A protein has these predicted regions:
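Central regulatory/effector-binding core of bacterial HTH transcription factors
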Residues: 1-34, 94, 102-103
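Beta->alpha turn/N-cap motifs
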Residues: 10-11, 27-32, 53-54, 105, ...
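Short hydrophobic/charged patches on amphipathic alpha-helices used for structural packing
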Residues: 15, 19, 66, 109-110
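Flexible hinge/capping segments at coil-to-helix
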Residues: 37-48, 52-74
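Short helix-loop capping/hinge motifs at secondary-structure junctions, enriched
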Residues: 55-65, 142-144, 155-161
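Extended ligand-binding regions for polar small-molecule ligands
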Residues: 67, 147, 151-174
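Secondary-structure junction motif
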Residues: 72-94, 158-167
Length: 174
């Protein structure tokens, strides 16, 4: 019998744990460093959104623009690569932002937002765990999307179970 242990962390932490031999396979949201890794990209992508209380004036909008967020207290993801992606989206306005918090877990950012502490910027998939009666999300416009990769370290011996799992993953490439 094979038992799989799931561990939730930022991509940077999982990457470090893989390089220390503590984790065999990682599931990463891009952008991610894939140096020294073999991987497959999952074809579905996820959209970036901003969360707010349902009675917030921004909740009436179909989508949220850079200008909508300039004076708002934002809760951004902790990952530097993601912050860089968002800096690119905000462009010259990035330095004008009020970044109230950074968070390594979207659900924590959601809890902070329900208490009026900020507007979490997150991938849409993470917001599925927010209670819609307390927090709604709107997509960013222009849209930003992110793909997911499943990765493992290149050229190292794995257990039979991990090797078989990697074979199954690679079957998706064909």
């Amino acid at each position: 019998m094979v038992q799989i242990a799931l561990h939730t962390a930022t991509a940077d932490s999982v990457y470090d744990m893989m390089n220390q031999g503590l984790v065999d396979i990682g599931l990463f949201m891009e952008p991610v460093n894939t140096e020294g890794l073999d991987y497959i990209r999952i074809m579905d992508s996820d959209h970036w959104v901003v969360g707010m209380k349902p009675d917030d004036p921004l909740a009436c909008k179909e989508y949220i623009t850079r200008d909508d967020l300039i004076d708002k207290p934002l809760i951004l993801p902790k990952r530097r690569n993601v912050q860089s992606e968002l800096a690119n989206w905000f462009g010259k306005d990035f330095n004008k932002l009020h970044i109230a918090f950074i968070s390594n877990l979207g659900t924590n950012a959601g809890v902070m937002a329900t208490h009026g502490l900020g507007y979490p910027v997150s991938i849409e998939g993470a917001t599925k765990y927010w209670r819609e009666d307390l927090l709604v999300q709107r997509r960013l416009y222009p849209e930003i999307s992110a793909s997911t990769v499943i990765a493992w370290r290149r050229n190292i011996p794995y257990s039979l179970a991990v090797s078989k799992f990697i074979e199954e993953i690679n079957a998706f490439k064909a």
